[in-house]
Structures are given as structure tokens and as C-alpha cells.
Design a protein with these regions (language model features):
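Catalytic domains of cell-wall/extracellular-matrix polysaccharide-remodeling enzymes
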Residues: 1-66, 73
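Structural recognition of the beta-strand scaffold that forms the well-ordered cores
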Residues: 12-15, 81-83, 127
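Flexible loop/turn segments at secondary-structure boundaries
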Residues: 22, 90-91, 135-136
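Short secondary-structure boundary segments
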Residues: 52, 84-86, 130
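Catalytic grooves of carbohydrate-active enzymes
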Residues: 69-95
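C-terminal domain-boundary segment and adjacent tail
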Residues: 96-141
Length: 141
């Protein structure tokens, strides 16, 4: 249904289908089972990313800036989405979720000078799903 709605509405969806270095490392062979859907997404004119990193949730909050910097330096060329759940937790946030420290660590990593400098030094281009969709429209299926 997720793929179907994305295609029908021409809304970009999270579809990793390139080299899948981190996606395979984190999710094993189940990533390969997505291939038929990825071909369908691309053929329908939607963007497909090269890789997906989801492992940062297990990083200790204090180590996130350094770990993210190392990850950025190790990325292969292409489009990689790195999932974070950045938040400035309120007083009640810990009552809603046990991940408030992790989310605060995500925010601190994403706004750190270390990560900002790494992005600049590695010539990493930050992008949005809208920009990916605009680029995809310029490419033939």
C-alpha cells in the first residue's frame, strides 16, 4: 500500500535500492527482498536512494557527534539517508518515550560544529525529498 500510494500521488517514498552497504549490514538479506518494489518505484518516476543507515539509534548519546562524523567520512558516493530522531526533550517527553536522551544526542550531533565541518570537508550535499523528486523528474526511467 505504501508503494502504491506513493506512485499514485507521485509522492517520494523511502526506497533504498542502490549499493545498500549499510542497509544490508543492518537488515541482512531482507533488504534484497525489496528489489521488485524498488524497480517499480523507479519505473513510476519516483526517486530511489542508494543506501539507508538506521543504526545510530543504538549509539550512546555522548558519542553521537563523533560517530556521525566518522559515518559521514565513510559514506560511498550516492544518496544515503541517515535516520535520526532529533528532539529537544521537554519535561514530559521522558513520560512519553524512553528515548529522550538518545533524541537529544541526535539533536546535538546534527547541530555540532564537528558534524557541520565534516559535511563541509567531505563536500556532502544535504538535500530534501522535494529536491530528489525534482532531480528524478529530469531523468528518464
Amino acid at each position: 500500500r505504501y508503494v502504491k500510494i506513493g506512485i499514485e500521488k507521485q509522492i517520494p517514498i523511502l526506497a533504498p535500492g542502490g549499493h545498500l552497504t549499510y542497509a544490508t549490514k543492518e537488515n541482512g538479506v531482507s533488504v534484497q527482498a525489496l528489489k521488485p518494489f524498488i524497480d517499480q518505484v523507479w519505473s513510476a518516476g519516483l526517486p530511489v536512494i542508494d543506501d539507508l543507515h538506521t543504526d545510530s539509534y543504538g549509539w550512546h548519546a555522548d558519542s553521537k557527534p563523533e560517530r556521525l562524523s566518522q559515518l559521514l567520512k565513510a559514506l560511498k558516493p550516492g544518496i544515503t539517508e541517515i535516520l535520526f530522531h532529533a528532539s529537544e526533550p521537554s519535561d514530559v517527553f521522558p513520560l512519553i518515550t524512553g528515548s529522550s536522551e538518545s533524541r537529544k544526542g541526535d539533536l546535538e550531533a546534527l547541530t555540532s560544529d564537528l558534524v557541520r565541518n565534516t559535511i563541509k570537508e567531505e563536500n556532502i550535499i544535504l538535500t530534501t525529498w522535494k529536491e530528489l523528486m525534482d532531480r528524478r523528474r529530469k531523468v528518464q526511467p
